[in-house]
Amino acid sequence: MKKIHLICNSHLDPVWMWDWEEGLGESISTFHQAELFCREFDFVFNHNESVLYEFIEEHDPDLFERIKEQVKAGKWHIMGGWYLQPDCNMPSGEAFVRQIGLGRKYFAEKFDARPATAVNFDSFGHSVGLVQILKKCGYDSYICCRPNPEMMDLPRDFWWVGKDGSRVKVTRTTDENLYCTAFGNAKNEIIRMASSYADGEVGVALWGVGNHGGLPSRKDLEEVTALIASSDDPLVHSTPEQYFAELEPKTEFTKSMQPCLIGCYTAMQSIKQKHIELENKLFTTEKLCAYAALNGLYTKNEDAFRKAEKALAALEFHDIYSGTCASDGEKSSLRKADYALELLQTEFNKAFFALCGKHQKAEIGEFPVFIFNSQPYAREAVCETEFLVPTPIISDTEQYTVSVYQNGKKIPSQCIKELSNINYDRRKRIAYRCELPALGEARVDIRLETEPKKFLAPTTGDEIVFSDSIKTIRISRKTGLMESCIVNGKEMLSGGAFRPVMYEDNADPWGWNMEHIGENPVDFVLCDGSTGPFEKLTNVNVIEDGDILTEVESFFWQGSSFVRISYKMYKDMPYTDIKADVFWNEQQKALKLKMPAAFDGQFIGQIPFGSDTFEKDGKEITAHRFVGFRDGENVLTLYNNCTYGFSAEGNDLYATLLRGAAYCAHPIGDRILIDPDRFIPAIEQGKHSFAFRLSYDPLEKLENNAQEFVNTPFSLNFFPHGNGNAAENVLSVENPAISLSAFYQEENGYVLRLVNNNAEPNETDLTLCGQSHRLSFGKYEVKTCFYDGSSLIEKEYWV
């Protein structure tokens, strides 16, 4: 005899082929009918996603109160407990915690509910980094439907083991209809699902009309009620928690549930890049406000941060973040994110000026600049700042030059091209190398002088050679590519690095039935200056050269598209920044950057709260802010703030930048994918920018180095009116292998989240408000601590 748990649900995408308003409106209709059926039939309705309940609470409060009564009666089960069902590959570990926290807090407050089973039926794959997050957010089990069985061979039920050793029970359902049943056909589909289980097994059947809400029909409920009464095997209306309480998996799985719909790792880069920008703005602003608050200078606007968290969580919805929604969903989601960024910038500004205003007034002729370091350790950094000179120089023979001082000592600096283009010398942009304190603001002072106007010498010869105490880089003027990068005597590249390559692709943003992105590669070639955005420009040219950096730009074209690659090589710093400005005019084509390495190293990349290894077989993988090839305890690393799709084949590393897919073009059997007799807009048309950093770094420092790259220190010319009583340092972390994921103020104290980016146990000294604490970590362990003003307490559950 087998027992089948019937979990009735109504999967409802707030956004997909439709926009938020339609999805949320459908939630009212679905929840109304569900509440009526709960009163009429003896069954349990399961639903998750607090964003939908919030919408009901606001727009139909009477229905909301009736739902609360059904929850109390056990007829309506709060399932999952997250804000919504996000993409489960691309959010950072910290973003996952916020996604879960929003739902957890809402359901606890409104329904006194704390689900133990997390549910992401429709997400397109699941990172192994989730396991520790699930466990430490109070979950013991997880149910999902993807990757589909034809995409990945998995046991139906297993123990999922995380990088730190955390374990949760998982069911990956294998039914062809995933999480729902066809309208009026639930009985037959439940019989089919039950038949896949053997005698003695505990099984699950997900049923109910879904994808656009809908519920089971009255006919479905009547027939399922009769089926339960007549079945020889127990069929019970149930919840995920009741199902997992009776399930004991017999196997373990220690990897990510990937690949799955690999086109989603790159499609709709506008959303992906906006998410990266927003999550880092949120976490950086929280740190700044916590620093200011502990100095008694500012208390954050909690409402602004909560709205920003919700905008971030909304952007993560699996049909938005993955780039598979219609164009209206892209537009409205970007609008939500920009609103959140504006809220956060207001908070950032208030805290920043409160801190900087305490500093000593400037001397006559000085231009003070303040730089905020969000990292919890002191470091040297190259920063860039613009400021305005009171009096312009309008001359072809004379110009301003600057000297920069920190603590009375002159530091290296260089004037570079400002962002504006008014043809006189008044707006100045400078690059300088300075010392930054742990989680705090540094001050430098600029002084002006005049000098005869200088011009860069024309670029000549077949190659451009940059050399300093750490590295030697060669850029060919015949190819425009980085042909060599020697670091401390060791060659990193095998030639031709950062070449743009175009591939044949298709209109499907999901990438159904694909393992690789693109076929039949065609290299971009140097522009001849005859047409396009780089018309009449030298195709490989030095555009900046001074005491801080040398910058070279190269111009390429292929098909109807153009790419500018810039190499910004910093003197006596271990890294080089590469930027790709893309003018993309292709449909059903893909764009990648190619980086051939000079050695055979293990392919690694960042995942939520950790890193993972990948095969070098050319198949598309998803990684976060770094990928690279491991070389012993060092890694040839490519950091980024712009994409999630990568692959490696042999010793060649590829970053996938763009696909020319159509909006929401989902394959339906063997039917044609898109209408051939009209213009169909492609998602990625127009100008895009992608930023990378190339460096050869110790493995344990990759996480912090990635944060340094993505969170460029904010700097501003500002004249303070204080008396020199600057804010005191409040936080520092000694071990470079330990990173600070979050530091924020909440009611009655402060939350700190720290990550051990190491496969071995680790320790660090942490100094907080003058008190020293010794913290011990297991492998890849993440700790959440609470500071109440006097003691630091580790939290068992994060939310």
Predicted feature descriptions by range:
Residues 1-94, 98-99, 107-109, 136-139, ...:
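N-terminal catalytic cores of secreted or lumenal carbohydrate-active enzymes
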Residues 130-133, 154-156, 183, 190-191, ...:
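C-terminal (or distal) subdomains of carbohydrate-active enzymes
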Residues 111-154, 214-223:
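Catalytic domains of cell-wall/extracellular-matrix polysaccharide-remodeling enzymes
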Residues 88-109, 174-196, 525, 550:
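Alpha-helical scaffold elements lining the catalytic groove of polysaccharide deacetylases
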Residues 10-26, 48-57, 81-97, 113-125, ...:
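The substrate-binding groove and active-site-proximal loops of carbohydrate-active enzymes
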Residues 29-33, 58-73, 99-102, 146-164, ...:
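Alpha-helical scaffolding within the catalytic cores
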Residues 11-17, 22, 167-357, 370-376, ...:
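Catalytic grooves of carbohydrate-active enzymes
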Residues 96-129, 133-136, 190-206:
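CE4/NodB-like, metal-dependent polysaccharide N-deacetylase domain
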